């Protein structure tokens, strides 16, 4: 194992997950840009924006909650309704993206299997829907390694140019999955 791989493993907590995943190779100026990506699908962009807006408004909801509990309760109900709409959008998107894939996910990157090899240092646009929150993310990534494994290719990619909101949403998803894994492990012991 290289020093870079060891450093990657120490820097972020990794989880095993099953997500909807699609990717597109980026070339030319798109590959080198650090701008946030936008999907051609308006539904995917809407889903992604819903979660970013939810994340960015959490501190406002906490402030309102300190001053007016009734208003905060109402806003939480409205937020749940919006979440349900987001889940309906995600179900539609899941049909378009394809069957869920088993991945290893961290704040720093992703590892997944693919039928075709990808060149090391290739730049990708990764379209992911993380469940059960139906969190849609479109992220830039660079292929770190591609290794053949039982007729498939294990692709390891590092996320690039994440916004703070994207990084926080990924971290929250990973923490929730980690907590879920711990609960399941405790239940299996009892």
Language-model segments: which ranges?
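Structured alpha-helical
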Residues: 1-190
């Amino acid at each position: 194992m290289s020093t870079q791989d060891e450093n990657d493993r120490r820097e972020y907590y990794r989880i095993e997950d099953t997500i909807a995943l699609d990717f597109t190779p980026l070339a030319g100026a798109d590959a080198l840009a650090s701008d946030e990506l936008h999907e051609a699908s308006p539904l995917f962009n809407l889903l992604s924006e819903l979660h970013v807006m939810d994340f960015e408004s959490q501190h406002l909801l906490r402030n309102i909650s300190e001053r007016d509990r009734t208003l905060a309760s109402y806003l939480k109900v409205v937020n749940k309704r919006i979440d349900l709409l987001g889940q309906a959008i995600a179900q539609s998107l899941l049909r378009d993206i394809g069957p869920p894939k088993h991945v290893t996910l961290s704040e720093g990157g992703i590892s997944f299997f693919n039928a075709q090899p990808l060149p090391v240092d290739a730049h990708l646009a990764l379209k992911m829907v993380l469940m059960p929150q139906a969190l849609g993310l479109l992220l830039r990534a660079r292929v770190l390694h591609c290794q053949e494994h039982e007729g498939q290719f294990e692709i390891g990619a590092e996320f690039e140019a994440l916004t703070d909101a994207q990084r926080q949403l990924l971290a929250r998803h990973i923490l929730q999955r980690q907590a879920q894994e711990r609960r399941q492990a405790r239940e299996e012991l009892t």
